[in-house]
């Protein structure tokens, strides 16, 4: 070792050595090309064995040895030694063939790992004959396949977990002093403090209480006048009356609606590579806000979202609520042609439903029995059966008569247009055929051969090559079926391209060109197009609609651009006998759910036994509830399964639903829940800090008609909520350093959305326009680089974009920077809680963001206007607006000195630049803007104290 150089192997460095070594190894192997099975096996073990190993062999594929890889699974050998480009395993991990592997949530292979795998295959895929098959990831051996699976018996002992028992209601314990003995919440909290030897903090001052309440319930600042009025009001009900005013405010739903939108993974774009805009998602957001403002009973709130269309008397609200299913992440490709997406969507819905409403993680049971909670793999598929009938459906929010008239008129116009479009297609057909043939001639020979080979005679490699070119092409029904080239024509309409643009087309660079027609044909086509345009004007405006769901059969969705038939068998042979959307009087059967099905191979899926719908066994003790509650309506066909599930979840007998919701409300008030893991009440979650209080609140929630606002009243009127946050007691800190038992009010930082809102509230420039389509916050063009997919309207900072943050557009592929740096959650899954980080980018955002600088100046203008020309009065008003209190003498003195110093600097700069006419008022405004900027960056401003 060189003199003067030493290694410091402390704990903070040793942990990284394995990762550094692994990175060096991967890079070296990838570069040198000397690859053996010792390099490949760890990659397979980490990324593949969970689904293709000892305990689980999805698609009958086992990757634990060379022989097994060569044997392959349902789609044939996974490996062609010496030819990575022809090997299915390589195509899948690189995304050349869908679905790309490994499936989420397992991360994609790194570039180095892909390079190692490719080199290994190209070198012949050598494998040490003496090397043992790598042990698979942990799991129950019984879960290897449906033929070997034996469902775990749920015992009474498993049901004894506290969260699976119905809440018991104990009388609140007697405590002293008297002010702690009037609210049951205080009685439980104080009894625990007494038992732990903790001393409660005194009550916070009134200025702190009003600011805390306003930020908590509305996410807005109280005005200086409201602060003064409350502080000077000595009436006994002053505080209670303030809470009632806030609960009655429309801004309450805007604040608390954002929390619920986290739970249901709400966003307004589909995510993934296309990230399409969900045009009516904002209606669901408005439904949530309205429901909270109306104090809709929580049990009805649950039922409407899961089965609003299946209610006996559905309303616009209940139909809008079914967008719960549609606001999650979705790919662009259709489920009927890509069944594995159907199962991914089912997993998303199961995860969101059980995690959001019941605090359970069921997704682990997709591949094996839950490792910690008594939830079996069969439970998972039973639960899937309760949802499996749903299909996407746009509900018209108009009277039925009006909807029927619109549909009839539209159908008639489209009937008249159809022959005109067919005539255009006949005119274009020979030109398209010629263009297609010319395009094919320019392709590589292997692609030409693949396209010309009849579909049923293509090899797996030819299918891949042909698909990369043919995706998005339509089949001409009038063409000669014996001529493979003639029966494939390029899609003619721009709207087809809009709805379906295959990624393979962009990747391979195959481009469609405009057709060059003869003058006569061009004239004829134009006449037909003009006729179509005139007819289209007769189509009435589409009535107001919302993207929701109803029951149907996803396998029979109408054909569209890019659709392909099910492989091997007809839909009828697969048991599909009904239709996409059943009409009144028509027999309807929910598609069967087969145990272990994943949509990757339909024939293999159907070998699994049909699973009957049902509920989680651990929560059903005795006679189970009915699995179907069809709507009592003659004009609507539905299975009633989703309604049965919704009513079971929303039942007072369900031990989890009420507990989970009151715990969420508690968490959103205090920054931590009575159960610190609000999305996991299972054995991997934390135990409740105050179990008797949690059960009392859950039973009271039900007794009060599932009223969320009533729980707010109880919490906010408690002494527990009104305690000071700055209280210090050495004994308390020693016994309970993290304030688990709430001996003082827990300080917490506001979310990014609330910070933006209170900045606008401080400057008095907030736009209170409520509801309707979302606005696009101004984002620098530099941030938008690389996010070309989907929509983000370019805007500037102006009143139209100064609406409350809950109404801003939420795009999965591009987060708004201010929200993102302040821990905006992942919108692809239910967010049980928000992470709270403290990182430099947060301070840098508030210091340098154009929006914050602009609002700082507007705040300074407000202060100057309302306080007059008295500088001390301006500083005092600034404090009152921003943090609801007067400055201390020292703060006032320091701030006046700061402003005067800034004015001197501004005046000197004006003199140096020759700006003699620079107004004194402008210099002072600039100086006050600096102080306002400091205030907006202070902890006291962005925290609830």
Task: Annotate each predicted stretch with a short phrase.
Residues 176-251, 265-313, 374, 418-424, ...:
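Primarily short, surface-exposed interaction patches in extracytoplasmic proteins
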Residues 1-11:
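N-terminal secretory signal peptides that target proteins for export/translocation
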Residues 119-124, 778:
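Short, well-ordered beta-strand segments
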Residues 15-27:
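Bacterial N-terminal signal peptides
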Residues 931:
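Globin-like tetrapyrrole-binding proteins
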Residues 28-118, 126-190, 207-212, 222-230, ...:
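Solvent-exposed helix-loop boundary motif
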Residues 61-68, 130, 136-171, 279-281, ...:
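Primarily the internal scaffold of c-type cytochrome electron-transfer domains
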């Amino acid at each position: 070792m060189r003199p003067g150089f030493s290694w410091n192997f402390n704990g903070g460095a040793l942990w990284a050595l394995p990762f550094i070594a692994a990175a060096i190894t991967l890079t070296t192997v990838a570069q040198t090309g000397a690859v053996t099975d010792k390099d490949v096996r760890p990659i397979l073990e980490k990324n593949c064995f969970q689904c293709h190993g000892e305990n689980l062999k999805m698609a009958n594929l086992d990757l634990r040895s060379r022989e097994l890889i060569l044997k392959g699974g349902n789609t044939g050998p996974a490996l062609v030694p010496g030819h990575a480009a022809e090997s299915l395993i390589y195509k899948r991990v690189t995304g050349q063939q869908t679905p790309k592997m490994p499936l989420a949530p397992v991360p994609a292979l790194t570039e180095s790992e892909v390079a190692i795998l490719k080199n290994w295959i190209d070198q012949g895929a050598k494998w040490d004959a003496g090397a043992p098959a790598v042990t698979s990831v942990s799991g129950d051996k019984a879960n290897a396949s449906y033929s070997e699976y034996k469902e775990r018996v749920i015992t009474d002992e498993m049901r004894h977990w506290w969260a699976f028992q119905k809440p018991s209601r104990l009388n609140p314990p007697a405590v002293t002093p008297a002010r702690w003995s009037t609210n049951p919440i205080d009685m439980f909290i104080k009894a625990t403090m007494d038992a732990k030897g903790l001393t409660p903090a005194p009550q916070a001052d009134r200025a702190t209480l009003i600011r805390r309440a306003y930020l908590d319930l509305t996410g807005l600042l109280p005005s200086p006048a409201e602060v003064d009025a409350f502080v000077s009001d000595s009436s006994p009900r002053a505080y209670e009356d303030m809470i009632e005013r806030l609960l009655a405010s429309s801004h309450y739903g805007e604040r608390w609606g954002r929390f619920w939108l986290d739970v249901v993974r709400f966003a307004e774009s589909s995510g993934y590579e296309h990230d399409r805009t969900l045009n009516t998602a904002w209606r669901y957001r408005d439904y949530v806000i309205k429901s909270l403002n109306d104090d809709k009973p929580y049990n009805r709130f649950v039922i409407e979202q899961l089965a609003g269309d299946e209610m006996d008397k559905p309303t616009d609200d209940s139909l809008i609520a079914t967008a719960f299913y549609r606001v999650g992440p979705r790919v662009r490709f259709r489920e009927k042609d890509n069944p594995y997406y159907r199962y991914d969507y089912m997993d998303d819905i199961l995860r969101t439903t059980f995690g959001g409403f019941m605090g359970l993680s069921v997704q682990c049971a997709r591949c094996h029995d839950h490792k910690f909670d008594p939830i079996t793999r069969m439970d998972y598929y039973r639960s899937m059966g309760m949802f499996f009938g749903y299909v996407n459906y746009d509900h018209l929010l108009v009277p039925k008569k009006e909807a029927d008239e619109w549909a009839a008129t539209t159908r008639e116009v489209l009937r008249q247009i159809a022959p005109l479009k067919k005539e255009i297609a006949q005119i274009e057909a020979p030109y398209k055929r010629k263009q297609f043939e010319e395009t094919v001639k320019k392709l590589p020979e292997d692609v030409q051969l693949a396209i010309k080979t009849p579909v049923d005679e293509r090899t797996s490699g030819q299918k891949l090559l042909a698909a990369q070119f043919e995706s998005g092409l339509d089949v001409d029904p009038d063409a000669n079926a014996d001529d493979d080239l003639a029966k494939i024509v390029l899609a003619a309409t721009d709207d087809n391209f809009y709805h379906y643009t295959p990624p393979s087309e962009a990747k391979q660079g195959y481009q469609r060109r405009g057709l060059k027609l003869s003058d006569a044909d061009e004239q004829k086509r134009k006449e037909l197009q003009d006729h179509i345009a005139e007819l289209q004007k007769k189509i009435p405006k589409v009535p107001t609609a919302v993207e929701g769901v109803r029951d149907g059969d996803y396998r029979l969705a109408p054909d569209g651009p890019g659709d392909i038939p099910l492989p091997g068998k007809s839909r009828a042979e697969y048991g599909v006998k009904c239709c996409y959307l059943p009409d009144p009087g028509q027999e309807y059967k929910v598609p069967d759910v087969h145990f272990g099905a994943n949509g990757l191979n339909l024939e293999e899926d159907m070998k699994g036994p049909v699973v009957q719908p049902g509920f989680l066994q651990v929560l059903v003790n005795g006679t189970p509830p009915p699995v179907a509650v069809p709507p009592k309506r003659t004009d609507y066909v539905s299975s009633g399964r989703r309604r049965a599930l919704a009513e079971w979840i929303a039942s007072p007998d369900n031990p989890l639903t009420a507990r989970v919701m009151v715990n969420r409300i508690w968490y959103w008030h205090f920054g931590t829940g009575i159960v610190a893991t609000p999305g996991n009440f299972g054995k991997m979650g934390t135990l409740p800090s105050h179990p008797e209080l949690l059960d009392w609140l859950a039973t009271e929630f039900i007794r009060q008609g599932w009223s969320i606002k009533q729980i707010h009243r109880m919490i906010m009127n408690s002494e527990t909520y009104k305690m000071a946050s700055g209280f210090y007691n050495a004994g308390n800190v020693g016994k309970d350093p993290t304030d688990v038992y709430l001996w003082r009010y827990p300080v917490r930082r506001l979310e990014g959305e609330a910070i933006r809102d209170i900045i606008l509230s401080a400057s008095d420039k907030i736009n209170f326009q409520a509801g309707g389509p979302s606005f696009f916050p101004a984002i620098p063009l530099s941030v938008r680089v690389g996010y070309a997919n989907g929509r983000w309207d370019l805007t500037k900072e102006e009143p139209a974009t100064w609406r409350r943050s809950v109404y801003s557009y939420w795009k999965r592929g591009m987060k708004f920077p201010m929200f993102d740096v302040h821990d905006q959650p992942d919108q692809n899954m239910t967010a049980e809680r928000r992470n709270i980080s403290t990182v430099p980018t947060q301070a840098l955002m508030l210091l340098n963001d154009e929006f914050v600088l602009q609002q700082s100046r507007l705040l300074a203008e407000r202060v100057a206007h309302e306080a007059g020309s008295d500088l001390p009065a301006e500083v005092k008003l600034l404090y009152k607006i921003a943090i609801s209190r007067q400055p201390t003498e020292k703060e006032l003195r320091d701030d006046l000195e700061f402003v005067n110093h800034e004015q001197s600097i501004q005046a000197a700069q004006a003199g140096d630049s020759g700006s003699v006419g620079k107004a004194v008022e402008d210099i002072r405004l600039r100086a006050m803007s600096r102080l306002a900027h400091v205030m907006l960056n202070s902890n006291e401003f962005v925290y609830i104290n």
